[in-house]
From Swiss-Prot:
Gene3D superfamilies referenced in this protein's UniProt entry, alphabetically: 3.40.1350.10
Protein name: UPF0102 protein PMT_0624
Family, similarity comment: Belongs to the UPF0102 family.
Record-annotated disulphide pairs: none
UniProt GO molecular function: nucleic acid binding
Any Pfam family: UPF0102
UniProt xrefs under HAMAP family: UPF0102 (MF_00048)
Species the sequence originates in: Prochlorococcus marinus (strain MIT 9313)
Top-level taxon in the UniProt lineage: Bacteria
Amino acid sequence: MMDSTGMGCWGEERVLRLLQKRGWQLVSQRWSCRYGELDLVVEKQQRVLVVEVKSRRSRGLDHWGLCAFNKGKQLRLMRAIGCWLATHPYFAEHSLELVMALVPLPPSQNTLDWIRIDDLDIDAAD
C-alpha cells in the first residue's frame, strides 16, 4: 500500500506521461516557493498548463479532495504561479491555464478527470 507521498508522486507521473503523449513538454515538476508547490508545469504551442494533481484512493464524500482546494489554497497557488512566472520570464507572454487532474487509485483504474480552474488572475494574488 502506498503512503500519501507515494500516491502523489505516482499520480503526478501518470498525469505527466499522459500529457507528454499529447505533445506537452515538461517545464517544471514539484517546483516550490514560500507560497507552496506547483505539481506540474507543462508547455505546448505558446500555452502553459499548471496542473494540480490530486490522487485519491477513497470513495467517500470528498473522494477527490476538492474540499481541500478552498479559497486559501487557491490564493496560495495563484501566488506560487506568480513566483514561478517571475523566475521563468520567457513564459510571460504565453497563455496560462490552471487545471486539476483527478487521479483515481488503485492504479488499475484507467480514467483521469480534469477540472479547469477558471478566472486565473495572477495579479489579484499579489
